[in-house]
């Protein structure tokens, strides 16, 4: 969760850093820049909620973190490399204090050296027949692996990795053939007029085709890797330091911060088109209706991008072979400025298109609602909230609380009986937004408590005296509901304002972060990136932290990820759980939660689909924990055959229909007639909602709330 500081708080936070930051001159090169970043990160970390001593023990944790990030599967560095690097194991604290790059440069130089060697090795592997009849195994669990002792072992490891990928590709082809045959047989059985031609390849043909595809994939992977600048890895190095403090304290490069801000605010200044990469070339992806690319009527999905002229006084930049994120940053820019694209159309013709950049909304960031018509004729409102977004730079920009309010008002006009607010997979967002959203459902009162590192506790209150919805309310959560989502679910529980349904507990992130932008205090135009720093913990108004434990559902429903290791409690260096005194609050709401729970448990115990879902989840988790797999073609295909036999019993899950009826709002219905992309997105959304067994139970539960 991100906290937006007031101007005063920002000044108080940064004053101790100013004297140090201002002493730097403009960097002459990347080494100077990285040195400055290291010093600033080190000083900023002292303001962490729970600062750690920068000593040898810290250095060892950083060391382990770094290699866990840079070579997690142990298929790049040799054991001799690791022995050489180990000399620095207890020196990384000193390097941070001095801004010394010796260890970073040594490891990254060696990484690029090994990648060059491995690239040549893989080319040699593909130049010879690949034998899939040998009785070998590939280790899937990285913790069971050792770094290769020498280059022969490195070669053998990559050969096994290639075999594993070829076998997977063969299985993918086989599964596609089987699906096509099944579809064809269904057409014949039902005497339909459709004709389905199934092209069947022999096993040898599949092997040859799979080998070529994996060869191309690996070759392209190395080409992309080599295009990355060595400084691009510096964020990984810095985060090895920061994440020892806690998992949510992270260094953001300027590019990473730009992407974060774009997603958080739900907007971007650009042309309104996705850029996609295929075989080293960049192509136009889907266009946003109403955005510059779409309005030009000169650009189509699938056009190949050859050049970009980012500014009128700049030359055209050839983007063939360029990384997607680099091309995207050429195309993006300031509002109302010109960008020129040179495109190759599908017919081979070359076209130059001039566009004026505009603010383009990323609609997937925003709340959306729909009316659900239940089998008994009652109507309920469903609001999907993907994030607690906010535009901190623009006071008139979109934010989650205003969007949710607008959706509630639209639903109220439909005379709905209750509201389901879905924050499954919502990872959080702005602290202010969750407080304001709670104010849509309750009168003036505390929503959440925050405590800083000194122990000072603040209570954040909703100031609204006029909630706009006082009817039945249900919150849907999952294992991925985190931070602000947990504040909302916790407050709804504490006030007994509504029911929380979903995964037995949420993610368990109970910390608050803010951004320190280093370049704001530097006498240079260079951008040094930002540090996202944990500065507070938050607590429910009952005094309990959500850290590690999350929020328990009133109506627990297990799902596909219930048995997986998902949540803050599985993260290294996560801050501990604790609690503080209860805030002074009262509630006029009352729910018979035990009755609702008993009724739900009876329904779920007799729901064959729900029980089958639990069996599927346990089986999938068992697969995920497999540590090795055979690389012999016959054994591999037999294993896949057995798995598919087991999967057959789960096919009912894909055919499930909750029998709920969904009605779009009239403005959205009208939009589907003009906007093909929006129509397809809406149809897909409704299709997925109809397959949602949790939503069906949510309707059952909210129907019983009196």
Q: What is each of the regions a protein language model found here?
A:
Residues 484, 496, 501-566:
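Polar, glycine-rich mid-to-C-terminal structural blocks
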Residues 9-10, 16-32:
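Bacterial Sec-dependent signal peptides at the C-terminal "C-region" and cleavage site
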Residues 37-49, 87-91, 216-220, 386-389, ...:
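Acidic/histidine-rich, surface-exposed loop or edge segments in extracytoplasmic proteins
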Residues 68-69, 104, 109-120, 130-175, ...:
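PDZ/PDZ-like domain segments forming the peptide/carboxylate-binding groove
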Residues 54-60, 67-142, 222-277, 338-340, ...:
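Extended, small/polar residue-biased N-terminal targeting/export presequences
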Residues 125, 140, 144, 156, ...:
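Conserved functional hotspot residues or short segments at active or partner-binding sites
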Residues 2-12:
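Bacterial N-terminal signal peptides that target proteins for export
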Residues 24-29, 45-55, 59, 223-230, ...:
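Cleft-lining beta-strand/loop regions that shape enzyme active-site pockets
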């Amino acid at each position: 969760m991100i906290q937006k500081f007031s101007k005063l708080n920002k000044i108080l936070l940064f004053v101790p850093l100013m004297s140090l930051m201002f002493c730097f001159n403009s960097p002459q090169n990347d080494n100077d820049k990285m040195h400055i970043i290291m010093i600033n990160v080190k000083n900023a970390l002292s303001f962490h909620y729970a600062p750690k001593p920068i000593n040898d023990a810290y250095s060892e944790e950083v060391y382990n973190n770094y290699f866990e990030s840079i070579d997690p599967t142990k298929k790049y560095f040799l054991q001799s490399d690791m022995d050489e690097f180990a000399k620095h194991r207890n020196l990384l604290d000193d390097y941070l204090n001095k801004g010394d790059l010796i260890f970073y440069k040594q490891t990254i130089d060696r990484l690029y050296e090994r990648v060059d060697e491995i690239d040549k090795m893989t080319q040699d592997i593909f130049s010879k027949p690949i034998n899939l009849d040998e009785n070998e195994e590939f280790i899937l669990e990285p913790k069971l692996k050792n770094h290769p002792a020498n280059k022969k072992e490195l070669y053998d490891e990559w050969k096994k990795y290639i075999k594993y990928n070829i076998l997977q590709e063969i299985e993918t082809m086989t599964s596609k053939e089987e699906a096509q045959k099944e579809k064809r047989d269904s057409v014949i059985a039902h005497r339909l007029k459709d004709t389905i031609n199934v092209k069947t390849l022999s096993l040898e043909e599949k092997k040859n085709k799979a080998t070529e595809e994996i060869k191309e994939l690996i070759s392209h992977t190395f080409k992309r890797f080599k295009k990355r600048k060595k400084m691009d890895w510096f964020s990984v190095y810095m985060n090895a330091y920061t994440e020892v403090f806690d998992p949510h304290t992270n260094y953001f490069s300027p590019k990473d911060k730009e992407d974060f801000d774009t997603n958080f605010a739900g907007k971007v200044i650009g042309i309104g088109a996705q850029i996609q990469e295929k075989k080293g070339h960049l192509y136009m992806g889907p266009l946003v209706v109403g955005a510059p690319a779409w309005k030009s009527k000169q650009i189509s999905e699938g056009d190949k991008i050859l050049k970009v002229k980012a500014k009128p006084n700049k030359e055209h930049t050839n983007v063939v072979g360029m990384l997607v994120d680099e091309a995207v940053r050429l195309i993006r820019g300031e509002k109302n400025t010109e960008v020129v694209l040179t495109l190759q159309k599908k017919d081979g013709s070359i076209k130059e298109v001039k566009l004026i950049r505009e603010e383009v909304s990323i609609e997937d960031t925003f709340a959306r609602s729909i009316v659900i018509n239940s089998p008994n004729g009652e109507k309920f409102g469903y609001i999907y909230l993907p994030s607690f977004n906010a535009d901190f730079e623009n006071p008139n920009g979109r934010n989650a609380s205003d969007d949710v309010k607008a959706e509630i008002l639209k639903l109220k006009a439909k005379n709905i009986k209750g509201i389901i607010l879905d924050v499954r997979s919502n990872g959080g967002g702005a602290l202010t937004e969750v407080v304001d959203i709670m104010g849509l459902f309750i009168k003036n009162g505390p929503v959440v408590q925050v405590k800083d590192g000194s122990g000072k506790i603040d209570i954040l209150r909703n100031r609204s005296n006029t909630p706009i919805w006082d009817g039945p309310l249900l919150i849907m959560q999952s294992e991925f509901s985190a931070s602000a989502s947990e504040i909302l679910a916790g407050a709804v529980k504490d006030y007994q304002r509504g029911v929380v349904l979903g995964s037995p507990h949420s993610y368990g992130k109970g910390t608050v972060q803010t951004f320190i932008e280093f370049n704001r205090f530097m006498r240079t135009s260079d951008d040094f990136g930002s540090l996202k720093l944990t500065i507070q913990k938050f607590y429910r108004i009952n005094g309990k932290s959500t850290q590690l434990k999350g929020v328990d559902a009133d109506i627990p429903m297990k799902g596909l990820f219930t048995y997986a290791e998902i949540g803050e409690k599985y993260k290294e260096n996560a801050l501990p759980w604790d609690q503080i005194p209860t805030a002074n609050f009262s509630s006029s709401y009352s729910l018979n939660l035990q009755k609702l729970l008993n009724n739900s448990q009876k329904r779920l115990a007799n729901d064959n689909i729900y029980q089958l879902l639990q069996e599927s989840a346990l089986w999938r988790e068992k697969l995920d924990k497999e540590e090795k797999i055979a690389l012999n073609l016959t054994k591999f295909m037999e294993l896949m055959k057995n798995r598919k036999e087991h999967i057959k019993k789960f096919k009912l899950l894909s055919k499930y229909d909750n029998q709920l009826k969904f009605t779009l709002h009239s403005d959205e219905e009208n939009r589907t007639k003009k906007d093909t992309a929006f129509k397809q997105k809406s149809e897909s959304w409704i299709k997925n909602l109809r397959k949602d067994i949790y939503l069906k139970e949510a309707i059952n539960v909210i129907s019983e709330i009196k």
